[in-house]
């Protein structure tokens, strides 16, 4: 499992333009399984903890509304960054990815992220 997580960080950080940070967090426990940031002032672990609240709020909203839907991802566009919260098909974890909006293409980023997370989806 550790190898799969490390491969995910390596592939994403080396191949997604504008990469800032990435983490993988279990939804039920809130435990961050792996995290990486290329910016010293970007606290990815703290961001992951708060993004867990975003995920739980959205899941609760869907439940309260009685929607028979699954959340695939949540995209948050900031002034200079794009944050993507990609939820696993089994709902057990989410990948949080932060990218520089001036350097990244969101469609390419999401396509590559889906490609690189395939092994993780199979392992968890």
In which residue ranges do the predicted regions lie?
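Non-catalytic interaction/Regulatory regions outside core domains
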Residues: 1-124
